[in-house]
C-alpha cells in the first residue's frame, strides 16, 4: 500500500467503512468499536450531509436497514472468499442450508469482509466490541468466532435498554425485548492486553448493611476477617496476635505494619482480631457482563 493511500490518525472519515479499512495498515489499531445496522428492518434518519454537493440529497435520505441478497451480497461473498476461505465456507454452508439468500444471509455477507479487515488492522493486544441486538447476535458471534479463528472470544455483555422497544403490548406473544448485546473479542488472547477493570458505586442499602461502623470523624468502615482459610495447608502462617493464636492471611511483618497503622483491632478482650476496612478505600462493585444500571446520555451530559 502506498503512503498516499494510507489513512491518517485522529480524523473522521466519510463513506463506506470497508473502503477506508482497506487503507489502514495491518496491526496498527488499539481498539475497535462498531455499532453496525442490526438488520432490524427499520428506517433511520441520516445525521450527516455528504461533503460532496451532488451527493447531498441522497445522503440526507433516510437509511433503510433492510438487507436483500440482490443488494451487493453476492459480490461481498466473493470478496470474503479472497480474504478467508474458512469464513467463506461457513457463510456458504449457511447459504446452502437454512438461511438461503434471504435478508439475514445478505446481512452476514456484508458484515464478513468488514470484520475480517478489522481483525487485520488490530494490534495483537487490541480488543473489538461489536454492538448488536439479540435478533442476529448469535449469527454474528458465530461469524466472529470464525474470523478470529476460534480463539478471540472474551465476553458477551448484556446491556439493558432504558426503555423497552415498542414491540410489546397487550396480547403480545413474546417477552419484552429490553437488551442489546456487546460481543467482545481480542485478536491474540495469549498476549497481554490493556484492560481497565471498571467499578460502579455501592448502593445505599449495601453501605448501610456492610459499613455501619464509623470513626468519630464519620469515616465508615467494617471489621473484616483476617484468619487464613485452609490453615497451614494453604501456606498461612500461625502466630499470636493480641493474645490470640490463629493461622493468619498475613505474614508477621505485614500484620505488625497494619497494627502500627491502627488497621487491626480487637472488638473485645479475647476476641479474634479483625481488619478495619474503610469504605473510602474500596473501589466499588466490579462491573460484570450484565449492564443494567447505565443511565442514558441526555442532551446536557458531558459526554455530548
Feature roles, as predicted:
Residues 2-24, 28-30, 38-142, 146-304:
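Class I S-adenosyl-L-methionine
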